[in-house]
Amino acid sequence: MTATKQHKKVILVGDGAVGSSYAFALVNQGIAQELGIIEIPALFDKAVGDAEDLSHALAFTSPKKIYAATYADCADADLVVITAGAPQKPGETRLDLVGKNLAINKSIVTQVVESGFNGIFLVAANPVDVLTYSTWKFSGFPKERVIGSGTSLDSARFRQALADKIGVDARSVHAYIMGEHGDSEFAVWSHANVAGVQLEQWLQENRDIDEQGLVDLFISVRDAAYSIINKKGATYYGIAVALARITKAILDDENAVLPLSVYQEGQYGDVKDVFIGQPAIVGAHGIVRPVNIPLNDAELQKMQASAEQLKDIIDEAWKNPEFQEASKN
């Protein structure tokens, strides 16, 4: 996609709770001029209905072409967003979904690429780091044009939780969750700050929360999805807005720094050949470059452990001949 292109087209694959919430966020925020929604044949009518329903909001926002799409419609899209996959059930971890969702991902990516698509993939289906890797493998695309939502939602949860504790606007809190979007993620406490004031210094001066409180805060952030799933069955609003933010950064060529699932080539020691959550600059051509926050020793160990866990799962999954044969990278 060129930064000057005026008509920007997004294809959404998966019209479930996350996908439909993302579509609504795009309409509500006036992002893109065209949105196609792909669903499996049994749910095609739902995609038709959602497209019609969403179109009724356009008089309040901005013009947009919205329709139930097929894979052929991906050919001239700027961005294909994959939310389709088996949902995470109560008691399941994101990594429990690997087997089911790898097969779904292979089918989707193969059909998108066969359409002649030459844009950017944005992956949100879980486990997102593993499925971002598989999207890269199945597509044969450059790593810069395959992006996962990564720890974008986790970092937003982290910032909001800190903001609530210390009584400031979350937009004034600058802090990241890195690693897997899942149980092995970690907080980068060493670089967390409030309006440029290091969090440690802020807490010394204001005493809003003690050390145990910080531990509890991180656990609540890490386990937020489990809490929500147990209460309402799924999470979708937060990730939908996170995806809309990433979409805007790509379509508007913002060169924004966002925490995403990006390919690792030794930025953090032995962390290689895996997609994992870290800040990166993203624009019209995908990932411009990772932003390599200098981690302290404890954080680096957590990053490496998180990556090793993901790598073990990927290596095990790729023993399946079906996935090996489909790999183009």
Curated annotation (Swiss-Prot):
Pathway: Fermentation; pyruvate fermentation to lactate; (S)-lactate from pyruvate: step 1/1
Pfam families, alphabetized: Ldh_1_C, Ldh_1_N
Modified positions (Phosphotyrosine) in chain numbering: Y226
Annotated GO CC locations: cytoplasm
Subcellular location(s) of the protein: Cytoplasm
Catalytic activity: (S)-lactate + NAD(+) = pyruvate + NADH + H(+)
GO terms, biological process: glycolytic process; lactate metabolic process
GO MF annotation terms: L-lactate dehydrogenase activity
Keyword tags: Allosteric enzyme, Cytoplasm, NAD, Oxidoreductase, Phosphoprotein
Annotated EC: 1.1.1.27
Residues annotated to bind beta-D-fructose 1,6-bisphosphate: R159, H174
EC category name: oxidoreductase
Documented activity regulation: Allosterically activated by fructose 1,6-bisphosphate (FBP).
Residues annotated to bind substrate: Q88, R94, N126, P127, V128, D129, D154, S155, A156, R157, T235
Annotated NAD(+) binding sites: V18, E39, K46, Y71, G85, A86, S107, A124, A125, N126, S149
Function noted in UniProt: Catalyzes the conversion of lactate to pyruvate.
NCBIfam families, alphabetized: L-LDH-NAD (TIGR01771), PRK00066.1 (NF000824)
Assembly description: Homotetramer.
Family designation: Belongs to the LDH/MDH superfamily. LDH family.
Name of protein: L-lactate dehydrogenase
Gene: ldh
